[in-house]
Amino acid sequence: MGGGVVAGFVPPPYPYDRLDELRAVTDRFDGGCVDLSVGAPSDPPPPEVVAALSTSNAERGYPASIGSPAYREAALGWLTRRFGIDAGDAALAACVGTKEFVASAPHYLRLRDPSRDTVLFPAISYPTYAMGAELAGCRAVPVAVDHQWCLELDSIDPDDAARALCLWVNTPGNPAGGLEDLAAIAQWGRDRGVPVFSDECYIEFTWGADAGASILHHGAQGVMAVHSLSKRSNMAGIRAGFFAGDPDLVGYLSEVRKHAGMMVPAPAQAAAVVAFNDDAHVDAQRAVYTTRLNRLRELFSTYDAEVALPGGGLYLWAASPDGDGWALARRVAEEMGALASPGEFYGPSGQGHIRVAAVAPDARIDLLEQRMAARRGDTVRK
């Protein structure tokens, strides 16, 4: 046998690693980089949640992969209390945050049905939907989105639908904040026998509505809602989420995941129970994000970028005046010391935009405003 390198899957550069050059530019500013590129919360979780991590007395035993009864009860109670969802015959199981679930679900689904080899996902979306397909050896097929950043179901090729393991939808959407018609999407999937996986991690941050929408409002058959505490409760470091919906799908995936050892640590489950049972901290966080989105919109509008407030989510999706997202990202790095994500990270059709995450502490946004005020003063003096 030869000693050559065997050709195979080579992971692409991680999107945010490609920002190192721009980060170096922002680091030169007094006060350093103001990072608006990643949606990692900066505000603290409720103190009761943090306390539960150290008082659960649950460190020694192996936790249930599906989640403890208290964990699942708290998650179901949150869905009912907060969104009026009658879970009915829906099943529910824990996941270790949602990113690992998004990345691994296609692999597990294909093991069950090797005749299907396609994952459908929004053309502008979280990169892990496509990566999950690639890691499973599947075709990653983007679905066109309309001017409101919502899926154009009529654009899906019938041959792709016939080969689809699943259709991913994300509402409120990342990066553009679109709000999907989940009733139509659920029906599309049922009519074609395609499971619909709805990533709803921003559901609490639906703007202009009393409550967010879940695909579970339209029944559990053939659908799955995926949720996380990362954004809702500022618990991205805890890695706690759940998937709920079609009992057959939940049963299959939870059994496979149990064999794979996918478990939310028991102390994290205890903390999650506390978080799911409290809504006051979420209401306070909603007010914080609303203010930040408006402040950042005003800042980025000075670049002649088209910046609308999102229907939901934590991001501004700003259109570059010259159609070059990288150029706009470089400009804000050089002039404001801020790091934003070029839109191409979320699909080729996003290349004319940047994504701005409203998660930086208020003091860092103060700093951006001070820098821009100083820059305007310099411009006037010149």
Annotated model-derived regions:
Residues 2-100, 275-276, 378-382:
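N-terminal small-domain helix-loop-helix segment of the aminotransferase-like
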Residues 29, 136, 191-192, 303, ...:
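Helix C-cap/helix->beta junction micro-motif
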Residues 107-169:
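PLP-dependent aminotransferase-like
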Residues 117, 191-195, 221:
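A short helix->loop->beta-strand "cap" motif at the edges of active sites that frequently abuts
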Residues 147-208:
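Active-site phosphate-binding strand-loop segment of PLP-dependent enzymes
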Residues 221-290, 375-377:
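Conserved core segment of the aminotransferase class I/II
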Residues 269, 273, 289-297, 307-319, ...:
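Conserved glycine-rich beta-strand-loop-beta hairpin in the small C-terminal domain of fold type I
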Residues 331-340, 346-382:
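PLP-dependent enzyme catalytic core of the Aspartate aminotransferase-like
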